[in-house]
Amino acid sequence: MTLSEACNVLHVNEGDNDELIASLIDALPDYIEVTTGLLPIHQDEEPLVKTLSGFLLTLWYYADHSDDQALTRTIDALTKALTLKAREYENNVDL
């Protein structure tokens, strides 16, 4: 995800907290790998990764978000779906 895409997701202007947003973007691939098992090399192929990344950025950037429980449930559901996708990649490599 680019800084421009992240700013669009967060509804902020580029230049507003760019360093913070960039650090959150940098954390996404490793976080997704740890939580789902989906390797970063496969993350670009999965459309759900971009969706999950947007929700994660929103949760992390707006830590005091009033609707964080609904957001967390959505993130949990997407994480489970990507975990299944990661297993598919794992099984295809083993063949």
Residue ranges: model-predicted function:
Residues 1-95:
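Divalent metal-cofactor coordination and adjacent catalytic microenvironments
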